[in-house]
Amino acid sequence: MAKSKYYVVWNGRKPGIYTSWSACEAQVKGYTGAKFKSYPSKEEAEAAFRGEEATPKLAKEEIIWESLSVDVGSQGNPGIVEYKGVDTKTGEVLFEREPIPIGTNNMGEFLAIVHGLRYLKERNSRKPIYSDSQTAIKWVKDKKAKSTLVRNEETALIWKLVDEAEEWLNTHTYETPILKWQTDKWGEIKADYGRK
């Protein structure tokens, strides 16, 4: 079950404390100079809203809503791994991978980004991709998933997919920007499975 989060909006259409990302997003999406942040408890959110915390820094860049967001849902690490890609603006699921029996979170994030690159290239789209995994972003740029997961019969499927993804990266070019989703400033990525 997903943990509750509280979203403080200092600068937005209606400043206040919200209990869901969608409610918070409605106040800040497209709002110039929006300031907001998520907190794990109501008490922390209330203290922050009263100004008992340093005013949060403005995001270095606005969210690019015309983009693709990818994320992984995992049960255990290593454990069952699945991923999906969604339209950042609407939340519409554009692709998803059925659960893989054994894998790691980072491997799933890597596969999700590469799937996103392939998806956008097939559609001649130059939209950027957001991922909340710095590790997976680096692996994609290096064209190599540096996972320490053992290769055996149990992990054969995820390693087959990773090998295929690395092969694709080494035989194709792309101009798609891969951007880090700033969870601490923007809340959970749109593709989040809500299992944290």
From Swiss-Prot:
According to the lineage, what is the superkingdom? Bacteria
Q: Which GO terms describe its biological process?
A: DNA replication, removal of RNA primer
Which keywords has UniProt assigned to this entry?
A: Cytoplasm, Endonuclease, Hydrolase, Magnesium, Manganese, Metal-binding, Nuclease
Listed GO CC annotations: cytoplasm
Q: How is the cofactor bound?
A: Binds 2 metal ions per subunit. Manganese or magnesium.
Q: What is its main location?
A: cytoplasm
As for subcellular location, the record says:
Cytoplasm
Report if keyword Translocase is assigned. no
Listed cofactors: Mn(2+); Mg(2+)
| Residues at which Mg(2+) 2 binds | 71, 109, 132
Any Pfam family from its record, for instance, is: Cauli_VI
- Which enzyme class, named as a word? hydrolase
Binding-site list for Mg(2+) 1? 71, 192
Q: Gene3D superfamilies recorded for this chain?
A: Ribonuclease H-like superfamily/Ribonuclease H, Ribonuclease H1, N-terminal domain
Q: Does the keyword NAD apply?
A: no
Q: What is its EC number?
A: 3.1.26.4
GO molecular function per UniProt: metal ion binding; nucleic acid binding; RNA-DNA hybrid ribonuclease activity
Biological function: Endonuclease that specifically degrades the RNA of RNA-DNA hybrids.
Sequence similarity: Belongs to the RNase H family.
Query: What's the protein called, per UniProt?
Result: Ribonuclease H
